[in-house]
Amino acid sequence: MTTIKHLAIIMDGNARWADRHNLTKSEGHKAGADKIRELLPEFINLNIPYITLYTFSFENWQRSSSEVDFLIKLLSIYLKNELDSLHENGVKIKVIGRLNLLRSSLQKQINNAIELTKNNNKIKLCIAFSYGSRQEIVDACTKIIAHGKKQVSEYDIQHALYDPEMPDVDLLIRSGGVYRISNFLLWQAAYAELYFSQKYWPDFNKDDIHEAINDYSKRKRTFGKR
């Protein structure tokens, strides 16, 4: 049992893991997707109500067309293969990002997954895809302006984000030995505790999750207070 309400993960290191094992980048990304399937039951057991996974950043559109195409295909395959199991296990699916950049068939698949699982309440799995936090904040402000607001509050921005119900991030984990948050949940992670692991994402296991949570439990969160 943990007090964490929102765990966010930057699943980094798939391509470098593949290089280390003389595999293709595509095989590395597939191993990363398989790791989500492996760890999700542990997230449920830990009773963490909200999980956000950074799967494809807005900046990732700048990668080679072959890698981008594979990552988009991988999301489609994941939803196709895992949706029934996720639904049966009470997982509520949310996908955030500039989804209008995706082909219409994938947008429909995403919407179907969201609709099917909308009443589930065991855990909320948020997939950040074609996502950038700066872009999210710009989109939120654009929405607010379109509604004719003259003055803008934090409340207005919060309720114009991709998922207004998303709680603030308690713990943000990044695998892969990189020490930055890469335009991920900048608004929601304002007071998040950060945990960086040297392990590549495909090598991550439930012991690593427990280690991160144990480290988090030892920290004193002051939120700017004393």
Swiss-Prot record:
Cofactors that this protein relies on: Mg(2+)
GO molecular function ontology, one term from the record: ditrans,polycis-polyprenyl diphosphate synthase [(2E,6E)-farnesyl diphosphate specific] activity
Residues where substrate binds: 13-17, 25, 29, 57-59, 61, 63, 174, 180-182
Keywords assigned by UniProt, alphabetized: Magnesium, Metal-binding, Transferase
Entry binding sites for Mg(2+): 12, 193
BP GO terms, sorted: polyprenol biosynthetic process
Active site as annotated: 12, 60
Domain of life: Bacteria
EC number: 2.5.1.-
Cofactor binding comment, as recorded: Binds 2 magnesium ions per subunit.
Alphabetized PROSITE patterns for the sequence: UPP_SYNTHASE
Function according to Swiss-Prot or TrEMBL: Catalyzes the condensation of isopentenyl diphosphate (IPP) with allylic pyrophosphates generating different type of terpenoids.
Quaternary context: Homodimer.
Family note: Belongs to the UPP synthase family.
Protein's UniProt name: Isoprenyl transferase
UniProt source species: Rickettsia prowazekii (strain Madrid E)
